[in-house]
Regions:
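PLP-dependent enzyme catalytic core of the Aspartate aminotransferase-like
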Residues: 19, 32, 367, 371-398
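Active-site C-terminal subdomain of aminotransferase-like
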Residues: 48-49, 224-314, 318
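Conserved active-site segment immediately N-terminal to the catalytic lysine
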Residues: 212-224
């Protein structure tokens, strides 16, 4: 007899036959316990979660309005302010990946017809262009070749020409490894009465960021890179200028799930009214990841990422390999793009690293497909022993 038939024959409760239904058993897959292979994740994200984060995420679930969970929310908000160096009250994690946080900034700030100027220096600038356009923005571009950064003069001229409501920049362009300088940008934005929005997905907790000092109005990030957490709870911050634009909207935010005018009632520290069920265990993980940042200290953490990046760059040079971003000051400490030598199959090398050494690195995509490897040293994974292991494996393969 099949499992379903046996159950039907035996199902009786207190002497009365249990009602059964014809169930299609075709997709009743019997599987073993999940056991994933050990990987050293040295790609552009996710990074390996810190052991303490994995322990935190296994805590008992409680309700998203439980007073104990409200305490978790408060801790996350305050530690995010430290990590971003901001006093913005409206700082919180979005339920979703970094792409959800990216969309949240645009959904709340962009109204149809708004001129949005996007700095395009790689794939994620292109994504900002796409997203802003979907919300009805009149999107303009200021761009440089993939691997370069925008100069202050580039930005100034574009602001003069386009007079945008919002300037959106990718601080750390994960597709190219380029770190966009921010000095002087906010002053230009203020002079043109536009908001400054930045993507810090790969730079949060890995490179110096000062939202308040830089005059950033809106920012977003993710949990699975520099914070060494699983994906699912993504930092988001608006200052008073951004909130004022949100308050002036002529219509509703065209995305219910990410509407900060209603989410605010859950995160404002007062009302705590239901909007949606928060990813409880992902929030546990984020809290622990932020605790690790606080314990280490920002200067120490930034210095660790920079030192290990330089160790990697020197080791790559010794192997005859070069970085795609030529100027070291413009390289992301947590993400290095390595030029693939002529005659070398980038995908084959990455495959051998994974299959023979359990090391994951990523290839390029978009304009850099097949031309670079992307190597991440993020958060918990930014350690000297990981650099040494990767360089030794590359030496053997190449």
């Amino acid at each position: 007899l099949k499992i379903g038939q046996i159950w039907t024959k035996q199902a009786k409760i207190k002497g009365r036959a249990m009602k059964t239904y014809p169930v299609n058993e075709a997709h009743r897959l019997e599987t073993g316990q999940l056991n994933m292979p050990p990987r050293l994740l040295l790609g552009p994200g996710p990074s390996n979660a810190h052991p303490r984060v994995l322990q935190a995420i296994s805590n008992q679930q409680i309700g998203h309005l439980d007073p104990a969970f409200i305490g978790v929310m408060n801790d996350i908000q305050e530690m995010l302010r430290y990590t971003w160096q901001t006093s913005n009250p409206f700082t919180l994690p979005v339920s979703g990946t970094g792409s959800a946080a990216m969309e949240a900034t645009l959904a709340n700030l962009v109204e149809p017809g708004d001129v949005v100027l996007v700095g395009v220096i790689g794939y994620f600038g292109e994504r900002l262009v796409d997203m802003a356009g979907r919300y009805g923005a009149d999107v303009r571009r200021v761009e440089r070749p993939w691997g370069e950064v925008l100069s202050l003069d580039d930005i100034s001229q574009a602001l003069d020409e386009h007079k945008p409501a919002i300037l959106a920049l990718v601080h750390a362009e994960t597709s190219t490894g380029a770190l966009q300088p921010m000095d002087g940008v906010a002053e230009l934005c203020r002079a043109h009465n536009c908001l400054l929005l930045i993507d810090t997905v790969t730079s949060l907790a890995t490179a110096p960021i000062f939202l308040d000092e830089w005059g950033v109005d809106a920012a977003y990030s993710c949990s699975q890179k520099g914070l060494s957490c699983p994906p699912g709870a993504s930092p988001f911050s608006f200052n008073e200028r951004a909130l004022a634009k949100l308050d002036r909207r002529q219509g509703k935010v065209p995305n219910w799930y990410l509407d900060m005018t209603t989410l605010a009632n859950y995160w404002d520290g007062k009302t705590r009214s239901y909007h949606h069920t928060a990813p409880i265990n992902s929030m546990y993980a984020l809290r622990e990841g932020l605790r690790l940042v606080v314990e280490e200290g920002l200067n120490e953490r930034w210095a660790r990422h920079q030192a290990n990046a330089e160790l990697l760059w020197d080791g790559l040079a010794a192997l005859g390999l070069s970085c795609h971003v030529k100027e070291p000051a413009n390289r992301i400490p947590a993400l290095t793009t390595v030029r693939v030598p002529d005659g070398v199959d980038a995908k084959a090398v990455a495959g051998r690293l994974l299959n023979e050494y359990n090391i994951e690195v990523a290839g390029g995509f978009g304009q850099l497909a097949g031309k670079v490897w992307r190597v991440g040293l993020m958060g918990f994974n930014s350690r000297k022993e990981n650099v040494t292991l990767l360089l030794a494996a590359l030496k053997e393969i190449l």
